[in-house]
């Protein structure tokens, strides 16, 4: 059986990934953005794929856009997830909270990344990685920038005091 591709717009992802909590509750502004822009993936989703929305609230908008433009995707609501045995899930980003949410909605565990994999992604997304990566990206004299990862108030104070015009 061919897997159906499902796109999910979860703009709270970076915050959820940073927290690492399975029960993460994003701020109201992020929840509102996720709700209002749930159909954002229709603009880049592959032909014949689905876009997740919490309810059919967005269906009228999608139908109107499909009348005007060639948008060959369909809406899938959260209650429909449990009845889909084969999904290729493509969120904005994976985190423990999204994994728990989808599992709670009945998505088969085999379709979700493991907590171990999410932990690896979380570690690879940490700011400390960008500090070591930035020098590797400076390929010639036209590339610039420095990155620091400071963890303690003492480090912050020392950093500011050692630089003229900092802040």
Explain the meaning of each model-derived region.
Residues 1-5, 85-88:
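A short, charged/proline- and glycine-enriched loop
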């Amino acid at each position: 059986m061919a897997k159906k591709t499902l796109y999910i717009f979860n703009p709270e992802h970076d915050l959820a990934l940073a927290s690492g909590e399975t029960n993460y509750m994003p701020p109201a502004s992020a929840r509102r953005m996720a709700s209002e822009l749930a159909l954002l993936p229709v603009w880049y989703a592959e032909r014949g794929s689905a876009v997740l929305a919490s309810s059919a609230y967005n269906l009228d908008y999608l139908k109107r856009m499909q009348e005007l433009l060639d948008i060959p995707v369909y809406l899938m609501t959260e209650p429909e997830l449990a009845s889909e045995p084969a999904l290729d899930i493509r969120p904005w980003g994976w985190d423990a909270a999204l994994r728990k949410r989808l599992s709670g909605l009945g998505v088969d565990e085999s379709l979700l990344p493991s907590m171990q994999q999410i932990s690896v992604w979380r570690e690879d997304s940490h700011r400390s990685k960008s500090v070591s990566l930035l020098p590797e990206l400076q390929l010639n004299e036209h590339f610039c920038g420095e990155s620091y990862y400071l963890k303690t108030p003492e480090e912050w104070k020392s950093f500011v005091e050692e630089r003229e015009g900092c802040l």
